[in-house]
């Protein structure tokens, strides 16, 4: 797969930032106040599916993408940086008759890939551009085809939104298209919606994600029969292992980001210390030369007199033994 050309992507980022914000980015003028409220983008993604009879059905998938307090939400589900694949309930509009959309609207379960990428605009500043792209993979278990991607650009500083906009580009030219689907992060954790409670009108067939508890019971309204409780499937060991590895990777990155500056500071001190000591020793040798080393013990010259060994028994040890025997006999 080929991704978007780097030149066109850089040009879009430059135009997005430079046109409305060139004054306060370059001259230091007062920045525009953040937008009031969290930006909400209800985008419609055009997709096509294949019917059972072989005909092509055109549909629109409606996704509500919001940004609030440094977090991106897709249909109230939090999405982190990278490519995340989520399955959620959303509004789907059939496009056979665009003049009467109410009769063609229905809720379905879609599987969608969401790309969230953060571009730092300036070094040492909290100003950054958040790019969001989406690709619909399935609708109610059926594969879909998508030609265009709606890209959302949000310019933020200190978690405050300065401006946001969106535009459409071909799927083949998007960053999301160049990233393999094998590296997608599967959104499987339950109860991560920013909304604490679900509307009482929601039935078991309308839950966004499955709960890991034994059953999920619905609130029975007057005049409405309860549905069969939905029994959830426990998370598989593979998903748990993936979550552990992802947590380990984040902890390792955090540890290395903390140790890396300390290591280089220590290395800098060592290099500066050794270099400085060598320079100081060289200067001392130049200005204070030393002819001899005081640390070495030197001895005075002494005349050596040769000593000649005198043999007291010139006849040898055998003669000495005979003399001793003679003396004994006497």
Swiss-Prot record:
Domain of life: Eukaryota
Topology of the protein relative to the lipid bilayer: Single-pass type I membrane protein
Extracellular topological domain: 24-268
UniProt keyword terms in alphabetical order: Glycoprotein, Membrane, Signal, Transmembrane, Transmembrane helix
Position of the signal peptide: 1-23
Subcellular localization: Membrane
Protein known as: Glycoprotein integral membrane protein 1
Organism from which the protein derives: Homo sapiens (Human)
InterPro entries from the UniProt entry: GINM1 (IPR042319)
Gene Ontology cellular component annotations, sorted alphabetically: membrane
Glycosylation sites: 46, 64, 166, 191
Cytoplasmic side: 290-330
The keyword Chaperone is assigned to this record: no
Membrane-crossing segments per the record: 269-289
């Amino acid at each position: 797969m080929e991704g978007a050309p780097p030149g066109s992507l850089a040009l879009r980022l430059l135009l997005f930032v430079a046109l409305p914000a060139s004054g306060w980015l370059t001259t230091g003028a007062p920045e525009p106040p953040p937008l009031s409220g969290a930006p909400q983008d209800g985008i419609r993604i055009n997709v096509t599916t294949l019917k059972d009879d072989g005909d092509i059905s055109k549909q629109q998938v409606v996704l509500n993408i919001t940004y609030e307090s440094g977090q991106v939400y897709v249909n109230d589900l939090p999405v982190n940086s990278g490519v995340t694949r989520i399955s959620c309930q959303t509004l789907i509009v059939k496009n056979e008759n665009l003049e009467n959309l109410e009769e063609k609207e229905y809720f379905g379960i879609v599987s969608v890939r969401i790309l969230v990428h953060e571009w730092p605009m300036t070094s040492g500043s909290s100003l950054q551009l958040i790019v969001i792209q989406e690709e619909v993979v399935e609708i109610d278990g059926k594969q879909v085809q998508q030609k265009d991607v709606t890209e959302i650009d949000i310019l933020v500083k200190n978690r405050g939104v300065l401006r946001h906009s969106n535009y459409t580009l071909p799927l083949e030219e998007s960053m999301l298209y160049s990233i393999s689907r094998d590296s997608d992060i599967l959104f499987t954790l339950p109860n991560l919606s920013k909304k604490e409670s679900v509307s009482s009108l929601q039935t078991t067939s309308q839950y966004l994600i499955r709960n890991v508890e034994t059953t999920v019971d619905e609130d029975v309204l007057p005049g409405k029969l309860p549905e069969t409780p939905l029994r959830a499937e426990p998370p598989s060991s593979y998903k748990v292992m993936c979550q552990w590895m992802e947590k380990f990777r984040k902890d390792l990155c955090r540890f290395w980001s903390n140790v890396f500056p300390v290591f280089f500071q220590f290395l800098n001190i060592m290099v500066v210390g050794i270099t400085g000591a060598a320079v100081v020793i060289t200067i001392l040798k130049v200005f204070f030369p030393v002819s001899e080393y005081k640390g070495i013990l030197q001895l005075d010259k002494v005349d050596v007199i040769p000593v000649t060994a005198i043999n007291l028994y010139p006849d040898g040890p055998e003669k000495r033994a005979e003399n001793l025997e003679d003396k004994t006999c006497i």
